């Protein structure tokens, strides 16, 4: 019995070993055949990705590597086991492939590279990376490449014609703040083009909501404000932001200097449009807005805010719109401007503000505001 049992164990071991060898053979042979299919232009074992066929996110090749293996996915072979020498080597090779993928995209995204300007075919590959990849570092590098190329006027049309606008806009749904910021930067560069603006207007509400709800003074918030500022350079799409003006004043009141200045650039675009005057006057402003003039605030911030007030005052016909003034609620910008004389008296005081230019501009604005708001009292 002992001998028969020993023979049985040996036989079983041989069968299991042969089976394992055969499985490894099939796996390696399958990978080789799949690579040959892809090298010949076929889809391999990956389903066709529509317009991105032949340029999927795992087809990006590194100029420094002769291999056509996938470099954007960290792929661990079935035989890679933790704690084994073979597994350690396999994982090291997988990490190396991922690193090469990142460098391959970043090489083209680098401003110091000679390959900064991509051809339409290369832009198509980068767009496919953005569309198909789920790896944050791949998305980040690809979006940097797109952002750099979108800075060139001739590439803005190419990226649009390749279907890049909805591809990049879809990334706005991500929760990764770094990736979202890069997507906003790409859209900001693309929005300089008039046709791109026409197509991007459908995303303005989403960008606006994300901007006002993002962490205060964050990179995502600033990138969103820059995009909205670009989208409101012309008067055509400013009405989309009419319901968010109060939120912008809230950001202005609570934000740091950089956030304040970016909000003011956006509000200045709106203030230059006479059609947006009523929306601006009806917006709720924080009570802390008046205290801005009581302290030694940044000079540029106060001067830009006064420029906004001047544009609103010039565009609003106070005497003609006297019946409509009853529609403005307490706490609105309209009532703030009516009571601006109180703030101005403090600013004009010698001890209130150290900058002579600010005090002069405040004095001129108050005089102009009084003449426009209370013309009958001047008679």
Curated annotation (Swiss-Prot):
It comes from the Eukaryota. The keyword Cytoplasm applies. GO terms for cellular component: axon cytoplasm; cytosol; mitochondrial outer membrane; mitochondrion; nucleus. Residues 89-98 are annotated as: Nuclear localization signal. Regulates mitochondrial aggregation and transport in axons in living neurons. May link mitochondria to the Trak2-kinesin motor complex via its interaction with Miro and Trak2. Mitochondrial distribution and dynamics is regulated through Armcx3 protein degradation, which is promoted by PCK and negatively regulated by Wnt1. Enhances the Sox10-mediated transactivation of the neuronal acetylcholine receptor subunit alpha-3 and beta-4 subunit gene promoters. Keywords: Cytoplasm, Membrane, Mitochondrion, Mitochondrion outer membrane, Nucleus, Phosphoprotein, Repeat, Signal-anchor, Transmembrane, Transmembrane helix. It holds the Pfam family Arm_2. It comes from Rattus norvegicus (Rat). The chain crosses the membrane at residues 7-29. Residues 30-379 are cytoplasmic. The gene is Armcx3. Interacts (via ARM domain) with MIRO1, MIRO2 and TRAK2. The interaction with Miro is calcium-dependent. Interacts with Sox10. Residues 34-69 are annotated as: Disordered. It is found in: Mitochondrion outer membrane; Cytoplasm; Nucleus. Residues 1-6 are mitochondrial intermembrane. Its main location: mitochondrion. This is Armadillo repeat-containing X-linked protein 3. Residues 1-6, 26-37 are annotated as: Mitochondrion outer membrane (MOM)-targeting sequence. InterPro entries: ARM-like, ARM-rpt_dom, ARM-type_fold, Armadillo, Armcx_regulator. ARM repeats lie at residues 111-151, 153-192, 233-272. The modification Phosphoserine is found at residues 61, 67, 72, 110. The keyword Transmembrane helix applies. Belongs to the eutherian X-chromosome-specific Armcx family. One of its GO terms (biological process) is axonal transport of mitochondrion. It is a single-pass membrane protein.
